[in-house]
Amino acid sequence: LFRDVTNKAIHLQHFEGKRVALYGPSTYRWIVNLFGIILAGKDVVLVDSFLPHKERESLLEKVGVDYILSSTNQYILADSHAIMIPGAEKDDVEGEYNPQTPEGNVLVFTATDKESDKAVVLTTQNLMYTVNAMNHHCYCSEHDRVLAQTMLFHIFGLVYSLLWPLANGACVCVGRGLRHIDAETYYYKTTILPGTPSMIEYLKRIKAFNPELRTIVIGGAPSSYKLFENLKDRNYNVYTIYGMAECSGGIAVNREMDGSYELY
Protein backbone atom coordinates (compact mmCIF):
# COMPACT_ATOMS: atom_id res chain seq x y z
CA LEU A 1 0.00 0.00 0.00
CA PHE A 2 2.70 2.52 0.97
CA ARG A 3 4.61 1.96 -2.28
CA ASP A 4 1.50 2.42 -4.39
CA VAL A 5 0.50 5.53 -2.44
CA THR A 6 3.97 7.04 -2.77
CA ASN A 7 4.02 6.42 -6.53
CA LYS A 8 0.61 8.08 -6.84
CA ALA A 9 1.86 11.07 -4.83
CA ILE A 10 4.93 11.42 -7.08
CA HIS A 11 2.69 11.34 -10.15
CA LEU A 12 0.31 13.97 -8.78
CA GLN A 13 3.14 16.29 -7.81
CA HIS A 14 3.85 16.80 -11.52
CA PHE A 15 0.59 18.80 -11.70
CA GLU A 16 0.20 22.28 -10.25
CA GLY A 17 -3.44 22.24 -9.10
CA LYS A 18 -4.04 21.99 -5.36
CA ARG A 19 -7.51 20.47 -4.99
CA VAL A 20 -8.63 17.05 -6.28
CA ALA A 21 -12.14 15.57 -6.17
CA LEU A 22 -12.26 11.81 -5.59
CA TYR A 23 -15.29 9.63 -6.19
CA GLY A 24 -15.95 5.99 -6.89
CA PRO A 25 -16.71 2.78 -5.01
CA SER A 26 -14.70 2.00 -1.88
CA THR A 27 -11.92 -0.12 -3.36
CA TYR A 28 -8.17 -0.52 -2.98
CA ARG A 29 -7.62 1.92 -5.87
CA TRP A 30 -9.85 4.49 -4.16
CA ILE A 31 -7.78 4.16 -0.98
CA VAL A 32 -4.49 4.52 -2.90
CA ASN A 33 -5.76 7.67 -4.58
CA LEU A 34 -7.00 9.09 -1.28
CA PHE A 35 -3.64 8.80 0.45
CA GLY A 36 -1.71 9.67 -2.73
CA ILE A 37 -3.52 13.00 -3.03
CA ILE A 38 -2.85 13.84 0.62
CA LEU A 39 0.84 12.89 0.44
CA ALA A 40 1.20 14.95 -2.74
CA GLY A 41 0.30 17.99 -0.64
CA LYS A 42 -3.08 18.46 -2.30
CA ASP A 43 -6.54 18.69 -0.77
CA VAL A 44 -8.82 15.74 -1.46
CA VAL A 45 -12.56 16.35 -1.82
CA LEU A 46 -14.57 13.21 -1.01
CA VAL A 47 -17.75 12.97 -3.06
CA ASP A 48 -20.62 10.48 -3.15
CA SER A 49 -20.32 8.68 -6.49
CA PHE A 50 -24.07 7.98 -6.47
CA LEU A 51 -25.02 11.65 -6.62
CA PRO A 52 -26.75 12.85 -9.79
CA HIS A 53 -24.32 14.48 -12.20
CA LYS A 54 -25.68 18.01 -11.83
CA GLU A 55 -25.73 17.82 -8.03
CA ARG A 56 -22.15 16.58 -7.98
CA GLU A 57 -21.09 19.36 -10.36
CA SER A 58 -22.72 21.93 -8.08
CA LEU A 59 -20.84 20.64 -5.02
CA LEU A 60 -17.50 20.64 -6.83
CA GLU A 61 -18.10 24.16 -8.08
CA LYS A 62 -18.65 25.28 -4.49
CA VAL A 63 -15.23 24.09 -3.37
CA GLY A 64 -13.38 24.94 -6.59
CA VAL A 65 -11.62 21.71 -7.58
CA ASP A 66 -8.73 21.69 -10.04
CA TYR A 67 -8.82 18.00 -10.91
CA ILE A 68 -11.05 14.95 -10.69
CA LEU A 69 -10.09 11.33 -10.05
CA SER A 70 -13.03 9.00 -10.59
CA SER A 71 -13.72 5.34 -11.24
CA THR A 72 -15.64 6.46 -14.35
CA ASN A 73 -12.35 7.58 -15.88
CA GLN A 74 -10.39 4.63 -14.45
CA TYR A 75 -8.83 7.08 -11.97
CA ILE A 76 -6.94 8.84 -14.75
CA LEU A 77 -6.42 12.47 -13.76
CA ALA A 78 -9.04 14.74 -15.35
CA ASP A 79 -9.68 18.47 -15.26
CA SER A 80 -12.51 20.09 -13.31
CA HIS A 81 -14.93 19.19 -16.12
CA ALA A 82 -13.97 15.48 -15.89
CA ILE A 83 -12.07 15.62 -19.21
CA MET A 84 -8.98 13.42 -19.00
CA ILE A 85 -5.69 15.29 -19.13
CA PRO A 86 -3.47 14.31 -22.10
CA GLY A 87 -0.44 12.33 -20.99
CA ALA A 88 -1.92 11.43 -17.59
CA GLU A 89 -3.04 7.94 -18.63
CA LYS A 90 -0.01 6.35 -17.01
CA ASP A 91 1.36 7.44 -13.66
CA ASP A 92 4.66 9.31 -14.00
CA VAL A 93 6.74 8.05 -11.08
CA GLU A 94 10.06 9.55 -12.16
CA GLY A 95 11.89 11.20 -9.30
CA GLU A 96 11.74 10.72 -5.55
CA TYR A 97 9.06 11.66 -3.08
CA ASN A 98 10.02 14.44 -0.68
CA PRO A 99 8.90 13.38 2.82
CA GLN A 100 8.96 17.04 3.88
CA THR A 101 5.96 17.77 1.64
CA PRO A 102 3.15 19.31 3.76
CA GLU A 103 0.17 16.97 3.80
CA GLY A 104 -3.05 18.01 2.09
CA ASN A 105 -6.41 18.35 3.80
CA VAL A 106 -9.57 16.25 3.53
CA LEU A 107 -12.86 17.90 2.51
CA VAL A 108 -16.13 16.14 3.27
CA PHE A 109 -19.65 17.39 2.73
CA THR A 110 -22.23 17.72 5.45
CA ALA A 111 -25.87 18.79 5.47
CA THR A 112 -28.42 19.99 8.00
CA ASP A 113 -32.20 20.12 7.94
CA LYS A 114 -32.15 23.82 7.09
CA GLU A 115 -29.08 24.13 4.90
CA SER A 116 -27.71 22.44 1.81
CA ASP A 117 -24.46 20.52 1.72
CA LYS A 118 -21.44 22.42 2.97
CA ALA A 119 -17.81 21.42 2.78
CA VAL A 120 -15.88 20.77 5.98
CA VAL A 121 -12.09 21.03 5.83
CA LEU A 122 -10.26 18.53 8.04
CA THR A 123 -6.52 18.34 8.52
CA THR A 124 -4.70 15.06 9.06
CA GLN A 125 -4.08 16.27 12.61
CA ASN A 126 -7.85 16.62 13.13
CA LEU A 127 -8.46 13.10 11.88
CA MET A 128 -5.62 11.53 13.85
CA TYR A 129 -6.86 13.22 17.01
CA THR A 130 -10.12 11.30 16.62
CA VAL A 131 -8.24 8.09 15.87
CA ASN A 132 -6.09 8.47 18.99
CA ALA A 133 -9.14 9.35 21.09
CA MET A 134 -10.88 6.20 19.90
CA ASN A 135 -7.87 4.17 21.00
CA HIS A 136 -8.50 5.30 24.58
CA HIS A 137 -11.91 3.63 24.46
CA CYS A 138 -11.66 0.66 22.11
CA TYR A 139 -8.84 -1.82 21.54
CA CYS A 140 -7.67 -2.51 17.99
CA SER A 141 -4.41 -4.26 17.08
CA GLU A 142 -2.48 -5.81 14.21
CA HIS A 143 -4.33 -9.06 14.91
CA ASP A 144 -7.71 -7.56 14.05
CA ARG A 145 -9.62 -7.77 10.78
CA VAL A 146 -11.86 -4.73 10.33
CA LEU A 147 -14.60 -4.94 7.73
CA ALA A 148 -15.06 -1.70 5.76
CA GLN A 149 -18.63 -1.96 4.46
CA THR A 150 -19.57 1.63 5.26
CA MET A 151 -19.03 4.31 2.60
CA LEU A 152 -15.52 5.68 3.00
CA PHE A 153 -16.45 9.13 1.68
CA HIS A 154 -18.59 9.56 4.81
CA ILE A 155 -16.71 10.72 7.89
CA PHE A 156 -17.79 7.72 9.99
CA GLY A 157 -16.62 5.21 7.39
CA LEU A 158 -13.40 7.11 6.70
CA VAL A 159 -12.36 7.29 10.35
CA TYR A 160 -13.63 4.05 11.88
CA SER A 161 -13.46 1.68 8.90
CA LEU A 162 -10.16 2.90 7.43
CA LEU A 163 -7.98 5.34 9.35
CA TRP A 164 -8.45 3.90 12.84
CA PRO A 165 -7.65 0.26 11.92
CA LEU A 166 -4.74 1.23 9.65
CA ALA A 167 -3.23 3.39 12.40
CA ASN A 168 -3.22 0.31 14.65
CA GLY A 169 -1.77 -2.05 12.05
CA ALA A 170 -5.03 -3.96 11.61
CA CYS A 171 -6.12 -5.56 8.36
CA VAL A 172 -8.78 -3.50 6.57
CA CYS A 173 -11.12 -5.76 4.61
CA VAL A 174 -12.79 -3.75 1.86
CA GLY A 175 -16.38 -4.78 1.20
CA ARG A 176 -17.05 -6.40 -2.17
CA GLY A 177 -20.35 -4.62 -2.78
CA LEU A 178 -24.04 -5.02 -1.99
CA ARG A 179 -24.27 -8.44 -3.62
CA HIS A 180 -21.92 -9.86 -1.00
CA ILE A 181 -23.02 -7.89 2.07
CA ASP A 182 -24.69 -10.93 3.67
CA ALA A 183 -21.53 -13.05 3.59
CA GLU A 184 -18.70 -10.53 4.07
CA THR A 185 -18.26 -11.10 7.80
CA TYR A 186 -17.79 -14.84 7.35
CA TYR A 187 -15.64 -14.42 4.23
CA TYR A 188 -13.15 -12.13 5.98
CA LYS A 189 -13.49 -13.64 9.48
CA THR A 190 -14.13 -10.15 10.81
CA THR A 191 -13.14 -9.31 14.40
CA ILE A 192 -14.26 -5.65 14.42
CA LEU A 193 -17.36 -4.48 12.57
CA PRO A 194 -18.06 -0.74 12.14
CA GLY A 195 -21.49 0.03 10.72
CA THR A 196 -24.52 2.27 10.71
CA PRO A 197 -27.46 1.27 12.95
CA SER A 198 -29.51 0.03 10.00
CA MET A 199 -26.59 -2.02 8.67
CA ILE A 200 -25.87 -3.64 12.04
CA GLU A 201 -29.57 -4.31 12.60
CA TYR A 202 -29.81 -5.99 9.20
CA LEU A 203 -26.74 -8.16 9.74
CA LYS A 204 -28.06 -9.18 13.16
CA ARG A 205 -31.43 -10.12 11.69
CA ILE A 206 -29.96 -12.36 8.98
CA LYS A 207 -27.52 -13.94 11.48
CA ALA A 208 -24.45 -12.61 9.67
CA PHE A 209 -22.28 -12.26 12.78
CA ASN A 210 -19.35 -14.63 12.33
CA PRO A 211 -17.80 -16.59 15.25
CA GLU A 212 -14.63 -14.44 15.29
CA LEU A 213 -16.51 -11.15 15.69
CA ARG A 214 -15.99 -9.56 19.09
CA THR A 215 -16.40 -5.79 18.65
CA ILE A 216 -19.13 -3.73 16.97
CA VAL A 217 -18.78 0.02 16.41
CA ILE A 218 -22.04 1.82 15.60
CA GLY A 219 -22.23 5.34 14.15
CA GLY A 220 -23.11 7.51 11.20
CA ALA A 221 -26.72 7.92 12.39
CA PRO A 222 -28.72 7.87 15.65
CA SER A 223 -28.90 4.39 17.17
CA SER A 224 -31.53 2.89 19.46
CA TYR A 225 -30.72 1.72 22.95
CA LYS A 226 -32.57 -1.51 22.15
CA LEU A 227 -29.99 -2.42 19.50
CA PHE A 228 -27.13 -1.60 21.86
CA GLU A 229 -28.68 -3.67 24.66
CA ASN A 230 -29.39 -6.62 22.38
CA LEU A 231 -25.79 -6.74 21.16
CA LYS A 232 -24.38 -6.40 24.69
CA ASP A 233 -26.60 -9.28 25.80
CA ARG A 234 -24.85 -11.38 23.15
CA ASN A 235 -21.51 -10.55 24.81
CA TYR A 236 -20.18 -8.27 22.07
CA ASN A 237 -18.07 -5.24 22.89
CA VAL A 238 -20.35 -2.48 21.59
CA TYR A 239 -19.38 1.16 21.02
CA THR A 240 -21.86 3.80 19.90
CA ILE A 241 -20.16 6.83 18.37
CA TYR A 242 -21.58 10.32 18.61
CA GLY A 243 -19.92 12.71 16.19
CA MET A 244 -20.21 15.10 13.29
CA ALA A 245 -18.10 15.81 10.23
CA GLU A 246 -17.17 19.19 11.71
CA CYS A 247 -15.57 17.36 14.66
CA SER A 248 -13.69 14.79 12.55
CA GLY A 249 -16.37 12.23 13.31
CA GLY A 250 -15.82 12.03 17.04
CA ILE A 251 -17.33 13.83 20.03
CA ALA A 252 -18.19 11.04 22.46
CA VAL A 253 -18.57 7.28 22.74
CA ASN A 254 -20.98 5.10 24.67
CA ARG A 255 -19.95 1.62 25.78
CA GLU A 256 -21.95 1.19 29.00
CA MET A 257 -25.44 -0.22 29.58
CA ASP A 258 -26.47 2.94 31.47
CA GLY A 259 -26.34 4.92 28.23
CA SER A 260 -23.68 7.35 29.45
CA TYR A 261 -21.22 8.88 26.99
CA GLU A 262 -17.52 9.49 27.48
CA LEU A 263 -16.21 12.61 25.75
CA TYR A 264 -13.25 12.28 23.41
Model-derived features: positions:
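Hydrophobic alpha-helical segments in the ANL/AMP-binding
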Residues: 28-46, 57, 134-136, 155-168, ...
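ATP-dependent adenylate-forming carboxylate-activation enzymes
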Residues: 4, 24-25, 45-60, 149, ...
